[in-house]
Amino acid sequence: MKNEISAFEKIYEVVRQIPKGKVATYGQVAALAGNRRWSRVVGYALHVNPDTENIPCFRVVNRYGEVSKAFAFGGENQQIRLLEQEGVKLVDGHVDLKKYQWERVTIEYLGR
């Protein structure tokens, strides 16, 4: 359990860094938190986010740029609203990752 808490804290620290108007994928957050295989762990951590004011979990989308249908803090439409308030444009619930993805990546994320 101690490692799980540590993993969650690493994930929250990465998500805190995602700038307004940008998004990151679950896999990107996982890699930046230290393990590119943690994509599902990122989802679990964000679902129980203890501080939505300072940990902007709505800025995390899947690898296709889709918002979460199970967004824990108001549902899919709320996640879309929050992203749009920051200037992120969505088409059919999708974010254009080429335009809005946060550029911070790691060698591990790139698979090198």
PLM features: what roles do these ranges have?
Residues M1-R112:
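Nucleic acid-binding interface residues in structured DNA/RNA-binding domains
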